[in-house]
Every structure is written in C-alpha cells, then in structure tokens.
C-alpha cells in the first residue's frame, strides 16, 4: 500500500514538474524574443500571449508612453485592426451554417439597387469572392465617410478581372459582407459579433464601442518617427477593423479557434481559394499548410499599432503579439518574431 502511494505521489509530482518546465520554457521564449524586438528602438512596447496545450502565458514589455515607463498590462486595450476580419469571417461562417447566406450567392441579391457594374462580362461577384479577396473590389472603399456614401461608392467601382480568379486584398469587400450579415440576421454587425463570438466565450473586454474607462486603457501608438498617431475612427460597419481587445481576451479567442469540435470554427477554417503552393484563403484566415505544418493567421495594422494573431492547431498552440508602433516594415518584423517564438517553444 505504501509503495502504491509512493508511486502515485511520484507520478503526480513528476507531471507537475513537467508542466512547470514547459511553462518556464514558454516564458523564457517570450522574454527572449520580446527583448530582441525592443532592441530596435522604433519599438516602445510589446505584449505577447501564448496558449499551449490549454495553458496560457502572457507577458508585457517596454513602455506605452515614451519616457514614462508605463508598461502595458493585461487590462491594456489594443486596436485589433484587420484581425477584426477574422470575427467577420466567423459570423459569415455561422450564417452559411444557418443557411442565411450561400457562398455562391450573387451579392446583388442583398442590395437595394441593381449595381450592374458589380460583375465582369456577366460573371457576378459572390459572397465567396468577398470573403477571399477575389471580388475585384478596390482596397479602400471609394467613399467611406458614412454608410450611405459607401453604397454610392459601390456604383463607381469598375470590375476589371473575373471574380474568383485574382487575389487582391480589399478593405471594401468585408464591409459589404458585414452589411449583408446585418441584413440577413436583422441585427447590427456589432450585435452579431457580440452574440456569436464575444458573449459565448466570455470576451467581455473585446468591443467595438468604448466607454470612458475603456478609452483611458486604450493604447496610443507611434510611427517610426516617434510621432503620436490617432486611433481609428469607425464610420462603417466594422467588417474590416474597429475591434479593441486585451491579451487575456485574445487567449480566449485562441481557445475558440483551437476548438476543433466547434462547427463554426471548422467552417471558417475551410480552404476557399488557393493562392499559392501551400497558401489558401479561408473565411478571412490566411492558411498555410504543407507536410510539416498547418497555420491559420492574420495580421492587423493601423495608424499607431500592429499585431499578429496565429493559430497552430496540430501543435495546439496560439500566439498573439501586439505593439504600439506602426510603420511599413512592422508587420514583417513581427512576423519574424512570431516564427522565432514558435520555433523556440516547440524545440
């Protein structure tokens, strides 16, 4: 009996030790890569969240305000910028499963006017084309001061390639997707994101609309000349950008995206358009798959901050990195940090 108790104690203690070692390994990897990033003096702070095998690790470095030493923390609110599109993709995937929309629907069936210009030689633009950046829409909306102007801008678009054939990143298309989702559910896009994503996953710190307390926690970012940049002002639906979140909430979002029993997640991760040898577009996810790896990821960049959100389902890992700096090379630099961090974690 004593021998059995000893064995049980040894097993439990051994398991705990392994968990502690793995946790320390993740913490060390985060610290190493964060400090290396901050050696580039264009960066002032960085927050990194990692979820591995259900265990989260969050660390913050640097200062939010130059010269103040005010390190970010778990309550710091970041602008997610284009990572918001993955929420748009999730709601769109739910709409497909709910049979509210069909990927092959001509988008004009959801519009109040005819828009004869939104086709190419008789080939219509579909929901799938909007979601995969293959619609032929311009990058930025031609008019975006308000929703009414947005639809006037749609009339000015000239489609010059067959929809579904050429990838061209568009911030116009996801806004139209958000409008269509509003129309089929008869709820605002903000309500849909809250009802389908935020509330079920207890992401109470992720939101489009901020109150006074939220605004005090919102990051103010810089460009590479250390000039303070404005926060994004949403004038349309929020299909392309507009969500704010914390590292703790982003860990909850990782848990959602790693839940392979979730039918909406599985739908949103489907490969809808093949862009390269091992590169696909999903429901606003960039998907990389080859013999060695499967990755779902998205980058977000706005005037004064940038971030990457990356999921590795085979390894049960999620990584989010956020910084209060934005310039042309920021995305590529952060991408390399994520790659290095991932390599250090799985060594």
Go through the PLM ranges and name each one.
Residues 57, 70, 138-141:
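Short, solvent-exposed loop/turn elements at domain surfaces
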Residues 77, 139-217, 235-251:
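Catalytic-site signature segments of enzymes, centered on catalytic residues
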Residues 79-82, 95-137, 156, 183-225:
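Active-site helix/loop module of the DD-peptidase/beta-lactamase fold
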Residues 39-47, 67-129, 161-172, 238-241, ...:
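Short active-site loop at a secondary-structure junction
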Residues 4-12:
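Sec-dependent N-terminal signal peptides
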Residues 15-62, 182-185, 191-195, 199, ...:
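Catalytic loop of the DD-peptidase/beta-lactamase superfamily, centered on the K-T-G motif
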Residues 60-68, 148-152, 221-226:
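Acidic-glycine-rich active-site phosphate/pyrophosphate-binding loop
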Residues 25, 29-36, 82, 87, ...:
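Extracytoplasmic/secreted proteins, especially bacterial periplasmic and envelope-associated proteins
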């Amino acid at each position: 009996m004593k021998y059995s108790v000893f064995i049980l104690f040894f097993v439990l203690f051994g398991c705990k030790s392994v968990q502690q070692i793995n946790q320390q390994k993740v913490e060390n990897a985060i610290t190493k890569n964060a400090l290396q990033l901050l050696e580039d003096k264009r960066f002032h702070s960085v927050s990194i969240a990692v979820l591995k095998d259900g265990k989260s690790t969050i660390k913050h470095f640097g200062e939010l305000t130059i010269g103040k030493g005010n390190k970010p923390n778990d309550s710091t609110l970041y602008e997610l910028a284009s990572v918001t599109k993955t929420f748009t993709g999730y709601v769109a995937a739910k709409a497909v499963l709910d049979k509210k929309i069909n990927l092959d629907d001509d988008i004009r069936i959801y519009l109040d006017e005819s828009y004869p210009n939104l086709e190419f030689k008789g080939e219509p633009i579909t929901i799938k084309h909007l979601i995969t950046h293959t619609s032929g829409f311009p990058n930025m909306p031609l008019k975006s001061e308000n929703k009414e102007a947005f639809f006037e801008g749609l009339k000015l678009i000239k489609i010059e390639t067959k929809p579904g054939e050429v990838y061209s990143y568009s911030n116009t298309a996801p806004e139209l997707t958000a409008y269509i989702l509003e129309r089929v559910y008869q709820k605002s896009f903000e309500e849909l994101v809250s009802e389908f994503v935020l509330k079920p996953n207890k992401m109470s710190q992720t939101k489009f609309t901020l109150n006074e307390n939220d605004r005090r926690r919102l990051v103010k970012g810089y460009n590479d000349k250390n000039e303070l940049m404005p926060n994004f002002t949403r004038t349309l639906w929020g299909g392309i950008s507009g969500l704010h979140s914390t590292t703790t909430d982003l860990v909850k979002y990782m848990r959602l995206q790693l839940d392979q029993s979730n039918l909406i997640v599985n739908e949103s991760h489907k490969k809808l358009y093949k862009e390269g040898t091992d590169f696909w577009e999903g429901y606003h996810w960039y998907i990389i798959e080859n013999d060695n790896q499967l990755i779902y990821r998205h980058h977000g960049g706005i005037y004064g901050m940038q971030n990457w959100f990356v999921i590795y389902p085979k390894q049960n890992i999620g990584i989010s990195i956020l910084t209060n700096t934005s310039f042309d090379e920021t995305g590529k630099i952060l991408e390399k940090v994520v790659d290095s961090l991932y390599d250090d974690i799985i060594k």
